[in-house]
Amino acid sequence: MKAGATSMWASCCGLLNEVMGTGAVRGQQSGFAGGTGPFRFTPNSDFSAYPPASAEGPNIVCKACGLSFSVFRKKHVCCDCKKDFCSVCSVLQENLRRCSTCHLLQETAFQRPQLMRLKVKDLRQYLILRNIPIDTCREKEDLVDLVLCHHRLGSEDDLDTSSLNSSRSQTSSFFTHSFFSNYTAPSATASSFQGELMGGDRTLGSGALAQEPSEIASANTEDDEDDDDDDDDDDDDDEENLEDRTPGLTKKRVRASLSDLSSLEDVEGMSVRQLKEILARNFVNYSGCCEKWELVEKVNRLYKENEENQKSYGERLQLQDEEDDSLCRICMDAVIDCVLLECGHMVTCTKCGKRMSECPICRQYVVRAVHVFKS
């Protein structure tokens, strides 16, 4: 009974599957999956049901603070370094936008004493914004020299562009004047021809009218020549100023020494390079020093030891002079303890005095050498 019920249930399930078409659907699904059915489907790697993600553009940020630009942080381009900065990190001066770093160095007028007072961070940032390598710079003075060199090169480029513009203005003025001269000549001839036909009065009037444009053209050429001469003089002055500045860089810098210090207060005002030069000159090792105050302590100790050595050396010289004054002038070994009679000079010891026949100072005959005792 139980087996018959099971077979009936299985046949009912098979009939239901045939009616609903589950087998055909399964066959089609297997055909799609395996690629062997009536509809062969080959997946394409280039096709996607979703649209491609839009490529995000480069995120432009401020070079100083690193924040992206927005409505409240508008983008501005520095007129010196040509980099992008926000309104907070840039300064508006004389209708020109400069970043804070360029503005800071512009305030120093690129003078060496003023640049030495700036921070190393600002000098490095100024050079990095201009894509100038600073790998070889070890001291602050190297950065200052590099900034001054780059500034002078930029001024030379400005001079070249100004001279190019002046030459272009000269050529344009030349072509303009030649055009006007060629243009006024036919009018002058026509007016003179009409004057001959109309009479003598018309001839004089037309001649005056013909002379006026030529006088104006000649006056313009003279003014342009004067302007060109002034530009040439300015260029010569700028070149002389550059020549005066360049020998200062070519001069050999004098190394710092311990004799340059007059007191311990002068040590604080010296740069790191000068401190290292003093230590190296006096054979002091500073390889473990990472901060400036460590170098200052070493130089202070060196200065104190040098002062003590000079004092002790002076005392030793004084004692040596005193000892030399009390030694016998003949043997330079024993102490002077003898007086020579009759002259009374004390220049020898008793042993040498008894051997002397005459005084070595006054050449008087020695009668007797008397031994004396110092109290």
Curated annotation (Swiss-Prot):
Any one annotated GO CC term: cytosol
Residues under site feature: Cleavage: 227-228
Acidic residues biased stretches: 221-242
Documented EC number(s): 2.3.2.27
Residues in SAP domain copies: 115-134, 267-281
Membrane topology: Peripheral membrane protein
InterPro entries: CARP1_2_FYVE, CARP1_FYVE, RING-FYVE_E3_ubiquitin-ligase, RNF34L-like_HeH, SAP_dom_sf, Znf_FYVE_PHD, Znf_RING, Znf_RING/FYVE/PHD
GO molecular function, one term: ubiquitin protein ligase activity
Annotated CDD domains: FYVE_CARP1, RING-HC_CARP1
Residues carrying Phosphoserine: 169, 257, 259
Zinc finger annotations (RING-type) as residue ranges: 328-363
Entry comment, domain topic: The RING-type zinc finger is required for the ubiquitination of target proteins. The FYVE-type zinc finger domain is required for localization and may confer affinity for cellular compartments enriched in phosphatidylinositol 5-phosphate and phosphatidylinositol 3-phosphate phospholipids.
Name of protein: E3 ubiquitin-protein ligase RNF34
GN (gene name): RNF34
